[in-house]
């Protein structure tokens, strides 16, 4: 991986790291809110629509298996280019899907591309950014994704409203991915002028030969801190699955759903840098625990509102509260994994840590879909809320042990 001195300026990462993340986030943000509605239009029931919505995080989990190896072998830039090309293919497949199963495969591939894309930028930031401002830098990276998830739903809703076609949200993703490719191909990457060891040779020398080997070698920290990160991932993925499903179940249109999700994403985006300041000044714990408790309580509240006369108003309020709570924890998974990763070759560990977080992110919406199939969406929502509060306790116990707070200089 790259090596770096402490002569760092934020503008040096703005275009090579943050702009591609923003564009990719816009594309994802346009597509995610309408996935359950499109799945329903292709013949899926409410539980089936939830299952298809979960495919994006299942794809991310599958992508975590080779992503650390891929980034270590071919580098961050080439990995992002490959991920952008895969996402274009996935969304094209979604546009031409003739049934729910084909659409689900497309969403899975989109998640796969997102995993490689995200890890490539995180690996670059981990080695390029000094430790003294790492949390702020990684929160800013997370904020660039969140800015995309904020802008994407609004652009998607606008296009759907103007054209009357939900397919325009998918076309927006393709456009964003093409721009990402252009940016990556023509823009200078700071890593090109930095000392770079032979990552393939280093990878073999350090015997970082695979994801599951890395997981085994770091099983202690991954069980204790990674399990909590898995709950964080589960809460976030459940939010992205439950809110659009809830909108379908109370009869909201695709355009209205995208607008409400966008409002929640705006609250999320507004707090990304504040999250980094909290982590750098007070410690990682004071970001993640309030975030998880806030999201858990919001989901518990939502679970009791489905049949109330003001169900739509409650839905809007909860979407905003969840956005605020998630924003307070912006960048926490990337920051914790960067804190714990070895400096010389962080990508395999980052992939392993992301795998544990994405395992939770994949299991949570699958569990939601299963509970909806046998019981109700309200029960599934309440259970996820309780698990979120329990996860806050796991991290409150283990973060001080593995990542003791050191005040920024």
Features from the language model and the residues they span:
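Core transmembrane helices of Major Facilitator Superfamily
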Residues: 28, 110-121, 321-333
């Amino acid at each position: 991986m790259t090596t770096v001195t402490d002569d760092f300026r934020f503008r040096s990462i703005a275009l090579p790291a943050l702009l591609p993340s923003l564009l990719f986030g816009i594309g994802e943000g346009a597509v995610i809110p309408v996935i359950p509605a499109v799945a329903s239009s292709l013949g899926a029931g409410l539980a089936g629509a939830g299952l298809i919505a979960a495919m994006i995080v299942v794809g991310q989990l599958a992508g975590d298996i080779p992503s650390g190896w891929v980034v270590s072998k071919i580098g961050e830039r080439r990995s992002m280019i490959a991920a952008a090309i895969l996402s274009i293919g996935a969304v094209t497949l979604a546009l031409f899907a003739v049934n729910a199963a084909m659409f689900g495969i497309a969403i899975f591939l989109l998640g796969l591309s997102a995993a490689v894309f995200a890890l490539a930028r995180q690996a670059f930031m981990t080695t390029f950014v000094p430790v003294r401002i790492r949390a702020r830098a990684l929160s800013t990276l997370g904020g660039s994704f969140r800015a995309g998830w904020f802008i994407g739903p609004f652009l998607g809703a606008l296009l759907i409203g103007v054209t009357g076609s939900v397919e325009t949200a998918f076309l927006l993703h393709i456009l964003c991915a093409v721009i990402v490719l252009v940016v990556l191909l023509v823009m200078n990457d700071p890593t090109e002028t930095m000392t770079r060891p032979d990552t393939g040779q280093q990878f073999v020398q350090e015997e970082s030969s695979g994801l599951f080997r890395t997981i085994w070698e770091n099983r202690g920290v991954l069980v204790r801190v990674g399990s909590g990160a898995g709950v964080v991932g589960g809460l976030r993925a459940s939010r992205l699955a439950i809110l659009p499903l809830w909108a379908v179940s109370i009869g909201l249109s695709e355009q209205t759903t995208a607008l409400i999700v966008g409002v929640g994403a705006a609250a999320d985006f507004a707090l990304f840098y504040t999250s980094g300041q909290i982590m750098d000044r007070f410690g990682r714990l004071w970001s993640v625990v309030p975030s998880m408790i806030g999201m858990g309580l919001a989901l518990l509240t939502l679970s009791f509102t489905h049949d109330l006369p003001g169900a739509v108003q409650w839905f809007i309020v909860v979407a905003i509260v969840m956005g605020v709570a998630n924003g307070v924890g912006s960048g926490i998974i990337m920051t914790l994994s960067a804190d714990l990763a070895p400096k010389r070759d962080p990508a395999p560990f980052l992939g392993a840590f992301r795998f544990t977080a994405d395992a939770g992110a994949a299991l949570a919406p699958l569990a939601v879909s299963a509970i909806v199939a046998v019981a109700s969406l309200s029960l599934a929502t309440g259970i996820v809320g309780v698990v979120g509060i329990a996860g806050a306790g796991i991290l409150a116990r283990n973060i001080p042990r593995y990542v003791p707070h050191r005040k920024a200089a």
